[in-house]
Amino acid sequence: MAGGAREVLTLQLGHFAGFVGAHWWNQQDAALGQATDSKEPLGELCPDVLYRTGRTLHGQETYTPRLILMDLKGSLSSLKEEGGLYRDKQLDAAIAWQGKLTTHKEELYPKNPYLQDFLSAEGVLSSDGVWRVKSIPNGKGSPPLTTATTPKPLIPTEASIRVWSDFLRVHLHPRSICMIQKYNHDGEAGRLEAFGQGESVLKEPKYQEELEDRLHFYVEECDYLQGFQILCDLHDGFSGVGAKAAELLQDEYSGRGIITWGLLPGPYHRGEAQRNIYRLLNTAFGLVHLTAHSSLVCPLSLGGSLGLRPEPPVNFPYLHYDATLPFHCSAILATALDTVTVPYRLCSSPVSMVHLADMLSFCGKKVVTAGAIIPFPLAPGQSLPDSLMQFGGATPWTPLSACGEPSGTRCFAQSVVLRGIDRACHTSQLTPGTPPPSALHACTTGEEVLAQYLQQQQPGVMSSSRLLLTPCRVAPPYPHLFSSCGPPGMVLDGSPKGAAVESIPVFGALCSSSSLHQTLEALARDLTKLDLRRWASFMDAGVEHDDIAELLQELQSLAQCYQDGDSLVD
């Protein structure tokens, strides 16, 4: 198993999932571009887990994400549904019909200035109508992504970002994008707002068959499919789309891993009553149904709460972000996702999605929380033991699952990844004869330092840890959020304004936590307070009163799994 690619197929369902996915694929693409850099560690992460090789109509080799994404009409902006990599304008222009023609032209969206710069750096449109790509990596350590001939940085402005396709710099396969034409992305009418609407989409033969055809296309070319990762909006009707997609995957591909990342955008406000009630109902239905059909489910949000009461967004000591901008929030969540998914993307690891889920989800605990330190605060001259000791006994991670602060909660099992720390900093370089200031300073390898630290933090808890040299890529179009970091991602007291940060160290974790007991119970309590007669429109979308009663029972049963005291070490 360790020697093969162990392919993963990614499903992106929803518009905020598109934002997170765009940053995620940009980061994978940036990592591919560094594959031949002599400073980069080789062979830690296997890009073939996420990417597939192919050929254009003109025989040029391509390397594109193994991806199916679903979004609503009007969400693509200037991006073509079939992508641009395989398109042949000569074939588009070939018309066999000899009779009278009437031409209808749809007004094109203006292309984002950032994407215009990006495409000019990536290749040229030749006179014969064929797109000539300068260089596309093939996943085997071949040439990196082509850069522009001028040093002009390709940095989009926040004002220019309307939709996720405005900053996606990765070419997609024609089988990737699936648009739901019956609902609109913009405007107040025709929105995909409710869980029942989303379920109904994949009950329609048209969309179900389209999804199944795309699944078969990607799955049949895999040598060893380890499973599926679903990036799914929880706050709107895509929670229902995700639930039906997970159910389909469970039925069709039994035994494969299904890890679902339930995504929620930034803060919300009390004044938006209907939107908040719908968000609560969609989140609750989504969590319960996705848990039933997934190997593992993890909510991801920078918000402080899943419930009706607004809480301030989480704070990162070394980041300055705007929680109202999906472009910022999704970048941070994608960085965490790029780190916590490392275990099933390693070249040398036998860990699969199923193994990771089994370790974290014992005793029915299929919902986990995520946390991360972005960036990991290693200052110049510090060692890893020095930096870890600064955290003291507190849980170091910023919570990313809207479950409140983790202090005082119990962890039942955890998977931890620390990446981007130079090997020379892994251990303390003490002068011979100097007594080590802590047990961490006495460790002889970085892996030992990390394992010892986790044992001190959570004695007796089942922990899996990974230490990687490979950092997380945050080059443009990633937003400039790192005001306290130098170019290598090191934390500085006062970095020069505008310093270019292209990679950072990140400390990320997935945890089966007792905090979920309180979070899920609070979600159930908020639901019991609702007067459903006021929200008949949600019920009209295909949800019955009996479904609400069953939902409450399932939420409370799930919450009981996380009562403190129920763990492997008891």
UniProtKB/Swiss-Prot annotation:
Protein's UniProt keywords contain Mitochondrion: yes
GO biological process, one term: mitochondrion organization
Modified residues (Phosphoserine): S495
GO cellular component annotations of the record: mitochondrial outer membrane
Localization, UniProt: Mitochondrion outer membrane; Cytoplasm
Coiled-coil blocks: none
Key words of the record: Cytoplasm, Membrane, Mitochondrion, Mitochondrion outer membrane, Phosphoprotein
Keyword Membrane found: yes
Broad class of where this protein is predominantly found: mitochondrion
Alphabetical list of InterPro entries matching this protein: DML1/Misato (IPR049942), DML1/Misato_tubulin (IPR029209), Misato_II_tubulin-like (IPR019605), Tubulin/FtsZ_GTPase_sf (IPR036525)
Family: Belongs to the misato family.
Function summary: Involved in the regulation of mitochondrial distribution and morphology. Required for mitochondrial fusion and mitochondrial network formation.
PANTHER family: MITOCHONDRIAL DISTRIBUTION REGULATOR MISATO, PROTEIN MISATO HOMOLOG 1
The protein's name in its UniProt record: Protein misato homolog 1
